[in-house]
């Protein structure tokens, strides 16, 4: 039986996680691992924070804190974000642990012992102004390969080519902005040329790798592999484990020790589980039964497919007591491309990004997981668009998937008292339904196994589409009046489809999957197979599975989150889709009266003079001549007293009621946004005032034949009502 060691790239503990990170290395891995677990495979899924190197020291320098304070804070922040996004790591560790120091130093010493390291004196970037050697990331300049400006001295973010500070054109200090000099400094280098041929043969034999990964790696090897430094002039990191004055006070380069974190985190995890020695079967070639799979973004391809395998080769055989084995080289490295935002690359410095922890404050995790999977940059860069996000959630999740599940559960409760009925004789469409169930399981599994997550999700949604079409064709609302056996068969088959959807959705939308399991009242463990719900099984009442995303939701998210990081980014997003007046209205409504000043401050930061001109215009309007309403216009309103005789939840909106109001000579149906302020019992039999001659209007699909009158001070809503009982239909004058 194959076992799997699955990793996601170690995120730097110097900032939060954005949607590009999630779509690149974490969500794909989680989908894959959840599928393996449903299949009953043996799998360990780990990641952890990368807590050394210049990104951490640079952040600490900017914030006036110690590196330890930075990594402790962001380790917890990132870990919590992944938990909220339902990324199901078996263990999320960190590299600032003794076990990681020990194993990393062991790798260094073994490579030195095997003559794969060389000590050299080389020119290192130095800032005369700040009186310090500069790590590569502290140096910026123009990339010599593509001409992109303001690129760091370790890698070009535009073309992806690794760099050294000496290669940069016009290099300067990223702290003070002054030109840099270069001074002699002794460091240890790994002789990458020792592994060139072996790496080339190994990569060429990986026929199952993604073309973008394989081609990138072979291109690098063809260019020639050179010696690369694996120690740095830094005071934060893992000390070089040698009694050598030349490297005293220096540390292991983070790009050397970070991937070793996959091993140290696994060791720490299994030690905590009481299985201290089991790490060997996941990282050593003991029986050929383990597949090591690294999920990464494309910027990490060279480090995982060239340098990391070279480090494993440089170590040689692992020997301990009765164990002697080679390290396992990666079985697969399914790297994803980049995610953009509204047609432009993510930029954390300009806050042109979707920060995951903020997005999850505004929308359910399943919504983010669904959309990122639907647009996953598997073979080319893809684009996050708020308009597309809204469309996909509303049309695909709500109208397709959620609608089908709700229909099936509603009918079994309405016509069979919540009990799964016996099937009668199957017709051709019934038989096709069972074929579709089996095909969906088989084909979705095959797509996930080959990392085609976007297609796999589409295949799941095709089963939901089939379910709706099946339901429409069989017309159970019609057969319920004339053929109960036919209705029972339709409902039974529909519920079988719902159950399989609950299984198929587990890798993609774990919360929705769990809710379907709850609504079906199932206690069995989910497995990647079709096991029927038996007739006679009782299910729960239908509940709304997904709520629609509104323009108001998106406006509030941009104003409340993106604008705080960079008002200019927020303005660009808002101007693309919305009128300024609409944004102001939504912001003031969502922030409420108590936070009005806060809302206005944010809006002013977004719109500047545009908002000030509008405010002056409104102030002049308010402070000048009062705009009177003519008596004749007022008399056009038909205000009448009524009594609420029925209150129901709106099926398509969680803040609205559908109420019936008795006006004496007729009963009107109204839609009212009172759920936050009144319970159903509070409203029932209450006298109210309505506008009776307001033109009917559909609100979320339900017609409202008038309007209830209420006072609203921004915090509370109070219905208007006569102070004593009067005849129903009495007119307000």
Curated annotation (Swiss-Prot):
Give the location of motif 'KMSKS' region in residue numbers: 345-349
Q: Where is this motif: 'HIGH' region?
A: 11-21
Residues that bind ATP, according to the entry? Answer: 348
Residues bound to Zn(2+) are 143, 146, 156, 159
Task: Describe its function.
Answer: Is required not only for elongation of protein synthesis but also for the initiation of all mRNA translation through initiator tRNA(fMet) aminoacylation.
Please provide, alphabetically and separated by semicolons, the GO molecular function terms listed in this UniProt record: ATP binding; metal ion binding; methionine-tRNA ligase activity; tRNA binding
Q: Which Gene3D superfamilies match?
A: HUPs, Isoleucyl-tRNA Synthetase, Domain 1, Methionyl-tRNA synthetase, Zn-domain, Nucleic acid-binding proteins
Name of the gene this protein is made from: metG
Q: What is its main location?
A: cytoplasm
tRNA-binding domain location, by residue? 633-733
This protein's source sits in the domain of life called Archaea
Protein's name according to its UniProt entry: Methionine--tRNA ligase
BP terms from Gene Ontology = methionyl-tRNA aminoacylation
Q: Which cofactor does it need?
A: Zn(2+)
- Family note: Belongs to the class-I aminoacyl-tRNA synthetase family. MetG type 1 subfamily.
| Any one GO CC term of the record | cytosol
Instruction: From the UniProt record, list the reaction(s) this protein catalyses.
Output: tRNA(Met) + L-methionine + ATP = L-methionyl-tRNA(Met) + AMP + diphosphate
Q: How does it assemble?
A: Homodimer.
Q: List the EC numbers from the record.
A: 6.1.1.10
Q: Which UniProt keywords apply?
A: Aminoacyl-tRNA synthetase, ATP-binding, Cytoplasm, Ligase, Metal-binding, Nucleotide-binding, Protein biosynthesis, RNA-binding, tRNA-binding, Zinc
Look at the named UniProt entry and state the broad enzyme category this protein falls under: ligase
Localization of this protein: Cytoplasm
Q: Which SUPFAM superfamilies match?
A: Anticodon-binding domain of a subclass of class I aminoacyl-tRNA synthetases (SSF47323), Methionyl-tRNA synthetase (MetRS), Zn-domain (SSF57770), Nucleic acid-binding proteins (SSF50249), Nucleotidylyl transferase (SSF52374)
The UniProt note on the cofactor reads as follows: Binds 1 zinc ion per subunit.
């Amino acid at each position: 039986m194959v076992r799997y060691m699955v990793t996601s790239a170690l995120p730097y503990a110097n900032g939060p996680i954005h949607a590009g990170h999630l779509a690149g290395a974490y969500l794909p891995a989680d989908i894959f691992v959840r599928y393996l677990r449903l299949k009953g495979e043996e799998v360990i899924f780990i990641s952890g924070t990368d807590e050394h190197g210049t990104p951490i020291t640079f952040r600490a320098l900017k914030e006036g804190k110690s590196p330890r304070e930075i990594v402790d804070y962001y380790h917890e922040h990132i870990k919590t974000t992944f938990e909220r996004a339902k990324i199901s790591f078996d263990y999320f560790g960190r590299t600032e642990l003794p076990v990681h120091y020990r194993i990393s130093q062991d790798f260094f010493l073994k490579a030195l012992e095997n003559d794969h390291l060389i000590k050299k004196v080389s020119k290192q970037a130095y800032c005369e102004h700040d009186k310090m050697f500069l790590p590569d990331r502290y140096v910026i300049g123009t990339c010599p390969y593509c001409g992109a400006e303001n690129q760091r001295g370790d890698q070009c973010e535009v073309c992806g080519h690794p760099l050294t500070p000496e290669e940069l054109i016009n290099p300067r200090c990223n702290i003070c902005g002054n030109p840099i000099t270069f001074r002699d400094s002794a460091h240890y280098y790994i002789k990458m040329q020792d592994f060139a041929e072996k790496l080339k043969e190994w990569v060429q034999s990986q026929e199952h790798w993604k073309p973008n990964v394989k081609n990138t790696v072979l291109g690098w090897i063809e260019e020639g592999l050179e010696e690369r430094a694996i120690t740095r002039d830094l005071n934060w990191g893992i000390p070089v484990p040698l009694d050598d004055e030349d490297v005293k006070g220096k540390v292991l380069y983070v790009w050397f020790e970070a991937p070793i974190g996959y091993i140290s985190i696994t060791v720490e995890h299994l030690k905590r589980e009481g299985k201290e020695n089991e790490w060997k079967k996941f990282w050593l070639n003991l029986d050929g039964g383990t597949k090591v799979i690294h999920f990464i973004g494309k910027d990490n391809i060279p480090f995982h497919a060239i340098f990391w395998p070279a480090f494993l080769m440089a170590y040689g055989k692992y020997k301990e007591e009765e164990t002697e084995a080679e390290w396992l080289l990666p079985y697969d490295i399914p790297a994803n491309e980049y995610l953009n935002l509204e047609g432009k690359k993510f930029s954390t410095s300009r806050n042109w990004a979707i920060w995951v922890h903020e997005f999850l404050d505004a929308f359910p995790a399943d919504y983010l997981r669904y959309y990122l999977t639907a647009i996953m940059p598997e073979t080319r860069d893809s684009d996050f668009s708020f308009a597309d996000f809204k469309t996909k959630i509303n049309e695909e999740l709500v109208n397709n998937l959620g609608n089908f599940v709700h229909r099936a559960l509603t009918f079994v409760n309405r016509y069979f008292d919540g009990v799964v009925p016996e099937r009668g004789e199957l017709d051709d469409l019934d038989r096709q339904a069972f074929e579709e169930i089996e095909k969906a399981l088989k084909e979705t599994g095959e797509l996930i196994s080959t990392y085609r997550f976007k297609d796999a999700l589409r295949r799941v949604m095709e089963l939901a589409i089939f379910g709706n079409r099946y339901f429409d064709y069989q017309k159970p609302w019609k057969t319920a009046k004339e053929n109960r056996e036919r209705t029972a068969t339709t409902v039974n088959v529909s519920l079988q489809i719902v159950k399989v959807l609950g299984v198929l959705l587990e890798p993609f939308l774990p919360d929705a999957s769990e809710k379907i399991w709850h609504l079906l009242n199932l206690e069995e463990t989910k497995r990647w197979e079709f096991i029927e719900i038996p007739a006679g099984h009782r299910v729960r009442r239908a509940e709304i599975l997904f709520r629609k995303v509104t323009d108001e939701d998106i406006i509030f998210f941009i104003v409340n989150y993106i604008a705080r990081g960079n008002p200019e980014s927020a303005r660009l997003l808002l101007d693309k889709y919305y009128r300024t007046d609409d944004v102001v209205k939504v912001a003031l409504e969502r922030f409420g009266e108590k936070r009005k000043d806060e809302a206005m401050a944010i809006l002013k930061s977004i719109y500047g003079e545009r908002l000030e001109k509008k405010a002056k215009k409104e102030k002049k309007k308010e402070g000048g001549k009062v705009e009177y309403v003519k008596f004749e216009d007022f008399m056009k309103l038909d205000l009448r007293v009524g009594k609420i005789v029925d209150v129901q939840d709106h099926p398509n909106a969680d803040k609205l009621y559908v109420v019936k109001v008795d006006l004496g000579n007729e009963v009107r149906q109204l839609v009212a946004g009172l759920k936050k302020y009144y319970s159903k019992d509070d409203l029932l039999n209450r006298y109210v005032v309505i506008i009776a001659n307001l033109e009917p209007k559909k609100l979320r699909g339900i017609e409202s034949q008038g309007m209830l009158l209420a006072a609203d001070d921004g915090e509370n809503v109070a219905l208007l009502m006569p102070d004593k009982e009067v005849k129903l239909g009495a007119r307000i004058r």
